[in-house]
Amino acid sequence: MKTINYYWRLFATAFCFFVFGVGGILIALLIAPLIILVYRDRQSRHIKGKLFIHYCFRMFIELMRLSGVLSYTIEGAERFKKPGQLFLANHPSLIDVVFMIAFIPRTDCVVKGKLSKNPFTYGAVNAAGYIMNAEPEAVLEKSIDSVKSGNSLIIFPEGTRTTPGGDFKFKRGASNVALRGGFDITPVIIDCCPTTLTKSDKWYHIPPRKLHFSMAVKEKISVDEFLDEKSANIAARSLTKKLEEYFIQEINNLCLN
């Protein structure tokens, strides 16, 4: 038998999705044009846009917490504060990127092109100047330039949300950014318990109890040992394998706790 708490969380989840949608439209209609009007320089405009989205997402996270949809913990949150970092994270849930942007002040990320046309997201995407996932070489160069300019770049190296119980495979794009840019990697281990908002879940498929979302920001992984490889492809493949093994071990440790 489903409890009053379950139906409250279902209502609260619907309300949070409603707020997110309305907020996205308001950003597109009011905030994004205002930022463009006030800040004529593109770089300044995108910095202000990123900060605005950061604060909006932080308030949205608190709305979900206060309404009883979820609780959260962050281990090593102080590591989010330093600018110009490359963050790699696993991707179990739809709200992973919302959490990361909410707690990293000046965040950049690679987004699907369709988000720049979606009425609920295009305002935020354009205001912040997020990187469109288009031609691979252009994405690589823009990603490197973004980190060098002081943004912190988020990459989910799986390329999509993790399928529960499925294979854990990384694409090489994140390794190419790290190696070409000479950036150490800050790994973030994300856990959702119970699982929710996976690729196969609808928004109303809420878990039987309140979701607890956790992020553990780990110590940097140096890429120096891979920079001397004669072949860039071999270096990227080797680093990707190391990262896969690292994340698999960390996630398995979560399952044991």
Give residue spans per PLM region.
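Catalytic core of membrane glycerolipid acyltransferases/transacylases, capturing the structured
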Residues: 33-55, 67, 81-135
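A transmembrane-helix-recognition feature enriched in membrane-embedded lipid enzymes
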Residues: 2-73, 123
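A generic structural signal for alpha->beta connector loops
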Residues: 69-71, 106, 127, 150, ...
